[in-house]
From Swiss-Prot:
Main subcellular location: membrane
HAMAP family linked: SecA
Subunit structure: Monomer and homodimer. Part of the essential Sec protein translocation apparatus which comprises SecA, SecYEG and auxiliary proteins SecDF. Other proteins may also be involved.
Cofactor note: May bind 1 zinc ion per subunit.
Gene that encodes the chain: secA
Protein name: Protein translocase subunit SecA
GO molecular function terms attached to this record: ATP binding; metal ion binding; protein-exporting ATPase activity
Chain residues that bind ATP: 85, 103-107, 492
Database matches in PANTHER family: CHLOROPLAST PROTEIN-TRANSPORTING ATPASE (PTHR30612:SF0), SECA INNER MEMBRANE COMPONENT OF SEC PROTEIN SECRETION SYSTEM (PTHR30612)
Span list, region Disordered: 788-841
Pfam families reported for this sequence: P-loop_SecA, SEC-C, SecA_DEAD, SecA_PP_bind, SecA_SW
Length: 841
């Protein structure tokens, strides 16, 4: 009964039926469009754009637009999309995943929805896994779009900023997923709006979508710089702070744990370090180091706040008294304590910006993708990306022979059998593709084939250009190719002359992958577009996946039957057990990716807030009101900490507040206790703000409107960038240590969300305090440049194009862009990075 209901109400069938009707409408226009001249066909683009301007939607134009691309493709490339390709294109336009078997023409399928969505002028991104495929598709398919009057861009790692901006400004941009992610991060580190390269993210079509959104989902893209200041400054600040005396040179409030230099302390600092004004923008880093050294000596107590164990500073949880191993204080405080205790000062975090593919691609207004294998991950695509997987029928029925698994006792027996099978097929001239899970297996089989004197090619996904060439030739008579399962994706294996008669391409799998999807990809290499082919997996009881579900019992059974190492078994029971083991592993992997996303969502929300505000800063002509509001918040906090509601006004430490305000915001003697005595807390805030506004207006009068506006931007950008980078580091440390605090009845994710939110609020307050302090106390230099602000920052800044992406071998894998010290600086100053952004104070 259930089976009948499923057939009647199967949503996939309904979707396919709907797409088929639409495809019939497109096909019905074929003859009319064939009669159009080239110019008339080109003019369709102008006509469609006009219709969109008049209020029609892209959905209204679908049938005609698809018919236009179909005819243009026939004229330009000689390829005429089949009906199933039209259906695949409709699925892509609707923001779904088209599951189309290998060889069904996914690349051509994408041209139709890409053209339709590019008509709005907002830009469409076609995403591939490597630059070779991006270049190839831009070259081959780009001709169709250019014939129809649209512009095509190719975004490569080697391009400079102007070339990248041009590539993104095109109607259609081909790029790799890595480059898109890194460009997004770089755009949110620029100092001028004009330096940005990407437009708002509109629509993306991802080729090999399962590889990018699932296999690489847990890979964070990280832009990192070399530590822009040496650890020497911590040691110097530590030595200086040891010479200071409490009350004379600094004040300490035990309740708020805040330590402040007095005027005398500042004078000593300026003398000790040979500078004129400690609050000058140039000396931001020095000021920060002194403040942290003071805090380390005065506010942080050994064996109370931290302990020293095996040469490491370990934080003590103030609530539980437990040691929080793996956690470090942020903003350089940990390094300051290390200097205080005479330990080796560790380098600070160098992460400048980070995002995962999951969160990058979820920012697009509309997202779609193509692959030959997505159905097994349908739930993940639906839950995380809100995309449905639509299995598109093949143009020709699949006649490939998928044979049952052959299972051997040992790996040695299995590999010998594989080599023997390859040798027999080689003798007949049938091409063979041997798929392996690991590079070591490829090398082992290569050795066995060499011993048998069989010529072959080994592929290990290092050289994309060469890889595609080898894969293309893998269908020729007598070809033997050994490849890791993922190698050569996106390149078809076309059968050579006379190969069909030999049974087509033989695909041999040397073990089952933990994901059924990867096994299906390997099978899909054979039998494209109705071609013949066979697939055969060889397994052994020693394979990792087999060991997972209790191969010992089966081994004992084989021993009882007296089976030797040369005889395989074909058992449905074992094959089913393998599949259920794969399903379990897939489920576990999905759960871990889902959990990662829940943790990553905390940082995503914070990143969106910071990047949005940062853009508003570089986009704004006048930040005065924003800066005044920041100062107001900072003053309210300062006043609040000295005028607690639970104390009587007579108990308020107003002398401490006056010292703080005069030192950090106004000038010595600007306000006195007498000025604020007897006032309510909000009256004190208003009084101080009036004095601050007077100082602000006087400063504006002195320097002029234009210079003051640029000065505000410099100060705000410096504060936002340095505090955000510290915050990324702190969140990373919190994330790594949070599971250690999963005490009874505690949900670590909830703890991470709550603590992460508190840390974000603290960061915002810290930004406001920094802006208030430096806007009021720094002097403006005549040749003020935004780039100079970064020299005083706590970390390095933006990478250059052409930098290496390196993968750090940690779990999860991280794709990192490093900044070379001799690279030209991103800011356009013409200086080397080490003499500009990477300059050490």
């Amino acid at each position: 009964m259930l089976g009948i209901l499923n057939k009647v109400f199967d949503p996939t069938k309904r979707t396919i039926s709907k797409y088929e009707k639409k495809a019939n409408e497109i096909e019905a226009l074929a003859q009319d469009f064939e009669k159009l001249s080239d110019e008339a066909l080109r003019n369709k683009t102008i006509e469609f754009k006009e219709k969109l301007e008049k209020g029609q939607s892209v959905d209204d134009l679908l049938v005609e637009a698809f018919a236009t691309v179909r005819e243009a493709s026939r004229r330009v490339t000689g390829m005429f999309p089949f009906k199933v390709q039209l259906m695949g294109g409709i699925a892509l336009h609707e923001g779904n995943i088209s599951e189309m078997k290998t060889g069904e023409g996914k690349t051509l399928t994408s041209t139709m929805p890409v053209y339709l969505n590019a008509l709005s002028g907002k830009g469409v991104h076609i995403v591939t896994v490597n630059e070779y495929l991006a270049s190839r598709d831009a070259e081959e398919m780009g001709k169709i779009f250019e014939f129809l009057g649209l512009t095509v861009g190719l975004n490569l790692n080697s391009l400079d900023k102007d070339e990248k901006r041009e590539a993104y400004a095109a109607d259609i941009t081909y790029s790799t997923n890595n480059e898109l992610g890194f460009d997004y991060l770089r755009d949110n580190m620029v100092l001028y709006k004009e330096q940005m390269v990407q437009r708002p993210l509109h629509y993306a079509v991802i080729d090999e979508v399962d590889s990018i959104l699932i296999d690489e989902a847990r890979t964070p893209l990280i832009i990192s710089g070399q530590a822009a200041k040496s650890t020497k400054l911590y040691v110097q600040a530590n030595a200086f702070v040891r010479t200071l005396k409490i009350e004379d040179d600094f004040t300490y409030d035990i309740k708020t744990k805040s330590v402040q230099l007095t005027e005398s302390g500042m004078t000593k600092a300026e003398k000790a370090f040979g500078i004129e004004n400690l609050f000058d923008v140039k000396h931001v880093a020095l000021n920060h180091h002194i403040a942290q050294a003071l805090k380390a000596h005065v506010a942080m107590q050994k064996d109370v706040d931290y302990v020293v164990e095996e040469g490491q500073v370990v934080i003590v949880d103030s609530f539980t008294g437990r040691l929080m191993k793996g956690r470090r204080y942020s903003e350089g405080l940990h390094q300051a304590i290390e200097a205080k205790e005479g330990l080796e000062v560790q380098n600070e975090s160098m992460t400048l910006a980070t995002i995962t593919f999951q969160n990058y691609f979820r920012m697009y207004e509309k997202l779609s993708g193509m692959t030959g294998t997505a159905k097994t991950e349908e739930e993940e695509f639906r839950n995380i990306y809100n995309m449905q997987v639509v299995t598109i029928p093949t143009n020709q029925p699949v006649v490939r022979d998928d044979r049952p698994d052959l299972i051997y006792r040992t790996m040695e027996g299995k590999f010998k059998a594989v080599a023997e099978d390859v040798a027999q097929r080689y003798m007949t001239g049938q091409p063979v593709l041997v798929g392996t899970v690991a590079v070591e297996t490829s090398e082992l089989i290569s050795k066995l084939l060499k011993n048998k004197g069989i010529p072959h090619q080994v592929l290990n996904a290092k050289n994309h250009e060469r890889e595609a060439q080898i894969i293309e030739e893998a269908g020729q008579k007598g070809a033997v190719t050994i490849a890791t399962n993922m190698a050569g994706r996106g390149t078809d294996i076309k059968l050579g002359e006379g190969v069909k008669e030999l049974g087509g391409l033989a695909v041999i799998g040397t073990e089952r992958h933990e994901s059924r999807r990867i096994d299906n990809q390997l099978r899909g290499r054979s039998g494209r577009q109705g071609d013949p082919g066979i697939t055969q997996f060889y397994l052994s009881m020693e394979d990792e996946l087999m060991r997972r579900f209790g191969a010992e019992r089966t081994m004992a059974m084989l021993d009882r039957f007296g089976m030797d190492d040369t005889t395989p078994i074909q058992s449905k029971m074992v094959s089913k057990a393998v599949e259920s083991s794969q399903k379990r592993v897939e489920g576990n992997n999905f759960d871990s990716r889902k959990q990662l996303l829940q943790y990553d969502d905390v940082l995503r929300q914070q990143r969106e807030v910071i990047y949005k505000q940062r853009f508003e800063v570089i986009d704004s002509d006048n930040l005065k009101s924003i800066v005044i509001n920041m100062i107001q918040s900072s003053i309210e906090r300062a006043v609040g900490s000295y005028t607690p509601k639970e104390e009587l006004p007579e108990e308020w430490k107003l002398d401490g507040l006056v010292e703080l305000i005069n030192t950090n915001y106004l000038d010595e003697g600007a306000i006195s206790v007498k000025d604020i005595y007897g006032k309510e807390a909000d009256e004190i805030t208003s009084f101080i703000m009036d004095r601050i506004k007077e100082k602000y207006d006087a400063k504006e009068e002195t320097y002029g409107d234009e210079q003051m506006r640029e000065f505000e931007k410099v100060i705000v950008l410096r504060a936002v960038d340095s505090k955000w980078m510290d915050h990324i580091d702190a969140m990373d440390q919190l994330r790594q240590g949070i599971h250690l605090r999963a005490y009874a009845q505690t949900n670590p994710l909830r703890e991470y969300q709550m603590e992460g939110f508190a840390m974000f609020e603290h960061m915002v307050a810290s930004i406001e305090d920094d802006v208030a302090k430096y806007v009021l106390k720094s002097e403006i230099q005549n040749n003020l440049e935004r780039e100079e602000v970064v020299q005083g920052q706590t970390t390095a800044h933006q990478p250059q194009e052409g930098d290496e992406e390196k993968t750090v071998k940690k779990k999860p894998v991280r794709k990192v862009v490093d900044i070379g010290r001799n690279s030209p600086c991103h800011c356009g100053s013409g200086k080397k990075y080490k003499n500009c952004h990477g300059k050490t104070e």
